[in-house]
Amino acid sequence: MTTTHTPLPPPPALVPMTQVFCQVGPLVTLGPGPHGERRYVPLGGGTVKGPELNGTLVEGGVDWQINRADGVLDIAAHYVIRADDGALIEVRSEGLRHGPAEVMARLARGEVVLPAEYYFRTVVRFTTGAPQWGHLNKLLAIAVGQREASLVKLDFYRLA
């Protein structure tokens, strides 16, 4: 193996997959922990629509969060998509949401905040036993999020 550095190859392409619109319940705070305030948000139903995946969200998912001392929200969401053909697809996503303190305060109050004003990104993995969706078990996706008062919108992009 040579240790000579060479130029990096072009980055992988991001291919639009789907948009997820998820209803969210009220925030539940569990109190402080060693890494910050522990909390969760129950996930309700929603819609999934896009060029590669369409369906609905199965009610009952959860968005686990740690509100860190540095103002970053550490997110770990777990939910299920029911594809239009009835197949169930488990979704796990982990990521971060942060921005200037005044922007995050507006989000917390349920005000409309433009997505460009804060950072909301997750890495997404899928698991399914449905043969027609088996390719999802072998890929990673990135989601760009937008939070509203009672709704989260996620734009999923498959890493090619």
Where are each of the predicted segments found?
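Beta-strand-enriched cores of mature, soluble protein domains
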Residues: 2-160
